A protein has these predicted regions:
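Short, ordered loop/turn segments at secondary-structure junctions
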Residues: 17, 71-72, 104, 127-128, ...
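N-terminal regulatory modules in eukaryotic regulatory proteins
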Residues: 128, 157-288
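Long, charge-dense, solvent-exposed interaction surfaces that engage phosphate-rich ligands
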Residues: 144-156
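VWA/integrin I-like adhesion module and closely mimicked acidic/polar interface patches used
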Residues: 112-146
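Domain-level signal for Mg2+-assisted phosphodiester chemistry and nucleotide/NA-binding surfaces
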Residues: 1-86, 91-92, 113, 121
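Short gly/pro/ser/thr-enriched loop/turn and capping motifs at secondary-structure boundaries
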Residues: 74-76, 129-133, 149-151
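Helical mechanochemical/support elements of P-loop NTPase systems and associated helical scaffolds
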Residues: 13, 21-24, 28, 51, ...
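Acidic beta-strand-to-loop metal/phosphate-binding motif
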Residues: 44, 97-104, 111, 115, ...
Length: 288
């Protein structure tokens, strides 16, 4: 459902060490592999600071190049400036098809917008505290906490009861847009693109939804696929239709239709009772 680059596309991964923990690196690299091939893998920070000492082993394991950037003065973020300059150099080199900016900092909002203006696919990654402007500037945004948790939970079987509970609660106060807003957005999209019978291609619905909500990811709500997530909401009908290829089926979705109750059997009309004829009293006396 989600727009993704081909696996052979080249992506520059630029990481802000000041705003990302080393525990997320594995999940970042794994997620990028779903979108393309990371050709540039750079991380920016002042590596003379003790708080970044724990990064060394991780950077070696994942072949990530650390870029040293001293803090020239207090209150100025030289790391951000170095990352932005490198991103523009890579852009003009013409060697990549997309960028992944990993940070929870809104300072990269304009950079993401500029890269998209140049026709590049931009993926943002950050923690749940990431400001909305940076999220909106990216074509897609992934929450690091969700990437980490979805990997550890992927081996656990999902029961219908679990899905329904997660679908109703996730997103509220957590990662991503509130599930109620997503549900209403899906209803609107279906109305806009459906056929005369109200059915719309599930793939098209997912594509439009991803464009309107850059941070939309079914994993935010405890699901790995769009179909079970939408089914858990209980307000949509989903059907599969066969194609000319027996191995391929297309899925369609429409807003749940009101149930038509069968008409109650008409009650038999009450029979009209004929008025009883009054008996004539016998005449007295003899006829003349």
């Amino acid at each position: 459902m989600e727009k993704e680059l081909d696996k052979d596309k080249k992506i520059a991964v630029l990481i802000d060490a000041d705003n990302v923990s080393e525990k997320y690196i594995k999940f970042i690299i794994d997620e990028i592999s779903n979108h393309g091939t990371p050709t540039y893998k750079r991380i920016y920070g002042d590596w003379t600071k003790p708080n970044l000492a724990s990064w060394k082993a991780v950077l070696l394991n994942y072949s990530i190049t650390p870029i040293q950037q001293y803090s020239y003065t207090t209150g100025k973020n030289a790391t951000d400036a170095a990352l932005i300059i490198d991103a523009m150099d890579i852009l003009y080199s013409g060697r990549v098809d997309g960028f992944c900016i990993v940070s929870s900092d809104s300072d990269f909002t304009r950079l993401a917008a500029r890269l998209r203006e140049a026709g590049k696919y931009v993926i943002g990654m950050g923690e749940k505290k990431t400001p909305t402007p940076f999220i909106a500037a990216c074509e897609k945004f992934k929450y690091l906490e969700v990437l980490a948790s979805s990997t550890t939970e992927s081996t656990e079987p999902e029961t219908p009861e679990t899905k329904r509970e997660v679908g109703q609660t996730a997103g509220a106060g957590g990662a991503g847009t509130n599930v109620t807003e997503i549900s209403e957005a899906v209803r609107t999209i279906i109305t806009e693109i459906s056929d005369d019978d109200g059915w719309a291609s599930l793939g098209e619905v997912g594509s439009v939804l991803n464009k309107r909500y850059p941070d939309f990811d079914t994993r935010n709500y405890g699901f790995h696929k769009l179909t079970p997530f939408l089914s858990s909401l209980g307000c949509f009908e989903i059907r599969s239709r066969k194609t000319s290829n027996p191995n391929v089926t297309n899925k369609y979705i429409r807003n749940q239709q009101p149930k038509v109750e069968p008409e109650e059997a008409a009650a038999p009309r009450p029979r009209k009772r004929k008025p009883r004829k009054k008996k004539r009293a016998p005449s007295s006396g003899t006829p003349s």
